[in-house]
A protein has these predicted regions:
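Active-site neighborhood of phospho(di)ester-bond hydrolases with catalytic His/Asp-centered motifs
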Residues: 35-38, 55-64, 92, 205-211, ...
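Active-site neighborhood of divalent metal-dependent phosphoester bond hydrolases
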Residues: 83-118
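Conserved beta-strand hairpin/beta-sheet module of binuclear metal-dependent hydrolase folds
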Residues: 1-48, 84-86, 146-148, 155, ...
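Active-site-proximal loop/helix segment associated with metal-binding centers of metalloenzymes
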Residues: 15-16, 130-207, 211-219, 226-228
């Protein structure tokens, strides 16, 4: 399971950070899923091996521009590049209305099947090698977090049970292991589900939109290997800014991840005021976000960088690529 950050800035881009967009890929195959689509996301894709033509679903967390202004351009480019495969768009109803207005007034044409699914707490959609669900968050507008659980986990065959029931090894074993039901020569049907189990635990990543109450993700994060969450500010700046923007600090997200025992945490969506290197005295640094989170979280901690990729290994480790 692979995570690639296409944009990691909040509100406005910087020289080194584009706006929110995160690609998620399964272990095998080229299909993938995109979470949010800030302005110029398609430009960022040109710097990666990811193909927009293999994109199967776009999950928008909320209508704010730094999370969805890149959507019309990406969809239009898919049309120009000859896309014919269906594409699923998930998000608040306002996202669909925004897209429809852009299509109307710019004469944007989309011929490939584009299915919109309004996000809600009952969301259960399969795309890009993942089973996707959602939970509502706390922000100035309707906002959601998404849980992506991998579905392409090989099955393990219960050979002992098959042999105990007198079913000899043969080509039928392979059918059952692929998840296919099997009819025996005597007419009996064997259900693959009765003779197989997952060979390992499916990996799970939770990617949240803007949110000032990390605890709202408790249900979605149950059993998760990775949480990707905004840390727009350090706690001191958040207190100065006040509650109105409804964002989180590194401290608040780190405390939540520690309480939930989430093994891997990647912080993203940093205010442009935080720089990688100081330009003048008094500049705030991204390193402060890391230091604050580390004081409250003992798991594996990373700060997202544009175009950086991370692998969640089969044993749940977060490895740089």
């Amino acid at each position: 399971m692979k995570i690639t950050f296409l944009g990691t800035s909040s509100g406005a881009p910087t020289r080194y950070r584009n706006l929110s967009a995160t690609a998620v890929q399964p272990e095998r195959g080229k299909p993938w899923v995109l979470v949010d689509c800030g302005e110029a996301t398609q430009h960022q894709l040109l710097r990666t091996p990811l193909s927009p033509l293999r994109l199967e679903a776009i999950l928008i967390t909320h209508i704010h521009g730094d999370h969805c202004y890149g959507l019309p351009g990406l969809l239009a480019s898919c049309q120009l590049n000859g896309r014919t495969a269906p594409l699923t768009l998930v998000g608040p109803q306002a996202v669909w209305e925004y897209l429809q207005a852009v299509m109307q007034f710019t004469e944007m044409r989309i011929d490939y099947p584009l299915q919109f699914l309004p996000v809600n707490e009952k969301l259960d959609v399969s795309a890009g090698g993942f089973q996707i669900s959602a939970a509502p968050l706390s922000h100035r507008t309707e906002c959601w977090g998404y849980r992506l659980r991998e579905t392409q986990v090989p099955l393990q065959l219960n050979v002992e049970r098959l042999q105990a029931e007198g079913i000899a090894p043969g080509p039928g074993y392979a059918h059952l292991q692929r998840g296919e039901d099997l009819q025996l020569a005597d007419g009996r049907w064997l259900s693959s589900a009765d003779y197989t189990q997952l060979s390992r635990r499916p990996r799970v990543a939770v990617i949240a939109g803007d949110n000032d109450r990390p605890e709202l993700l408790a249900g979605l994060c149950e059993g998760a290997d990775l949480l990707v969450h905004e840390a727009t500010y350090t706690e001191d700046i958040l207190l100065q800014v006040g509650p109105e923007p409804q964002h989180s600090s590194a401290e608040r997200v780190a405390r939540f991840a520690e309480q939930q025992r989430i093994p891997n945490l990647i912080l993203t969506h940093f205010s442009p005021r935080y720089l990688s290197k100081p330009r003048r005295q008094g500049d705030r640094l991204v390193a402060e976000i890391r230091a604050e989170a580390r004081r409250h979280y003992s798991g594996q901690l990373q700060l997202a960088e544009d175009l950086a990729s991370w692998l969640i290994s089969r044993d749940g480790m977060l490895l740089p690529l």
